[in-house]
Each structure stands twice: as structure tokens, then as C-alpha cells.
């Protein structure tokens, strides 16, 4: 008899969870990373840097998993109260929209994307003529 050939691609084993990360949080991070076409490792690196995967983190005026300023979230379309940014999905929706702009300016470099996310990238986007692409100006 001929050997049976499987047409199912092998499954890659799931990466272990990061400290403080839950399976539910992993699912949310992956969903929003994919939604904004961002590399998942970049988003996890940012979550580790900003809050060690803690959606309820607060540091001065910064809120949530990715430590976004309410004013920055508002510039990305957020209309809630600052405390709403302590919800992981809400934080990811607006912070990753911001990270998407930083990623577009990073030339594919994770460290550069995080640098632009942390310090802001309006003037760089303006210099490159990318205000619309980065979400900083309506098209």
C-alpha cells in the first residue's frame, strides 16, 4: 500500500506566556497585532517594556498595557474616559493604531518603532510626507 501523505501543515508549538500574561491577554494582543498588520513579537516587546503585560498599569499620566496617554488615544479616535484605557482591548485598539504609525516609519526595525512610539513621531511623519499613512491626519 502507498504511504499516507498528510496535507495538513505541521502546527508550530505555542510560545510560552510571558510573566503576567494570560492566555486571554495573548489572544487579545495577537488579534490587535494582526488587525493593524504589526509583528506580534514587536507588540509583545512593547507590552513587556511598558507594563510587563499588566493591563491595569498606571504610571503618572500613562494608562494600561501599552502606557498610552489619553490625549494620544484621543488623537487615534478614542472617546472614553482615561480609566477606559485600563481595559486591555481598548488600550490595544488605540495604542496599536499609534504603534502602526511608528512601525511604518521604522523601516522594519523593532527598536526604531518602539523609539518612535515612545517619543512621538509627528515631525518625522510630516518630514516624510506620511501624516495620512500614519494616521496622524485624515485622508
For every predicted segment, state its role.
Residues 61-78:
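Substrate-binding/active-site groove segments that recognize
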Residues 38-54, 95-96, 117-118:
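Short, functionally critical alpha-helical segments immediately adjacent to catalytic or ligand/cofactor-binding
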Residues 51-54, 72-75, 120-123:
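Solvent-exposed loop/turn segments at secondary-structure junctions
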Residues 1-8, 19-24, 79, 83-86, ...:
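Non-catalytic cell-wall polysaccharide-engagement segments
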Residues 12-48:
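Export/targeting segments at the very N-terminus of extracytoplasmic proteins
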Residues 61-64, 84-88:
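A glycine-rich, coil/turn loop motif that links secondary-structure elements
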Residues 24-31, 41-42, 67-71, 90-101, ...:
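Extracytoplasmic/secreted proteins, especially bacterial periplasmic and envelope-associated proteins
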Residues 57-59:
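A short gly/proline-enriched turn/hairpin at secondary-structure junctions
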Amino acid at each position: 500500500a502507498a504511504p499516507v501523505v498528510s496535507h495538513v501543515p505541521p502546527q508550530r508549538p505555542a510560545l510560552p506566556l510571558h510573566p503576567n500574561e494570560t492566555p486571554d491577554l495573548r489572544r487579545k494582543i495577537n488579534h490587535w497585532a494582526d488587525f493593524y498588520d504589526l509583528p506580534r513579537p514587536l507588540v509583545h516587546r512593547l507590552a513587556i517594556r511598558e507594563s510587563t503585560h499588566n493591563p491595569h498599569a498606571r504610571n503618572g499620566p500613562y494608562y494600561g498595557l501599552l502606557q498610552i496617554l489619553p490625549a494620544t488615544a484621543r488623537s487615534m479616535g478614542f472617546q472614553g474616559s482615561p480609566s477606559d484605557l485600563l481595559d486591555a482591548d481598548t488600550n490595544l485598539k488605540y495604542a496599536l493604531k499609534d504603534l502602526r504609525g511608528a512601525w511604518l516609519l521604522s523601516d522594519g526595525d523593532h527598536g526604531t518603532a518602539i523609539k518612535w512610539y515612545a517619543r512621538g513621531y509627528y515631525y518625522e511623519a510630516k518630514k516624510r510626507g506620511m501624516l495620512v499613512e500614519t494616521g496622524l491626519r485624515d485622508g
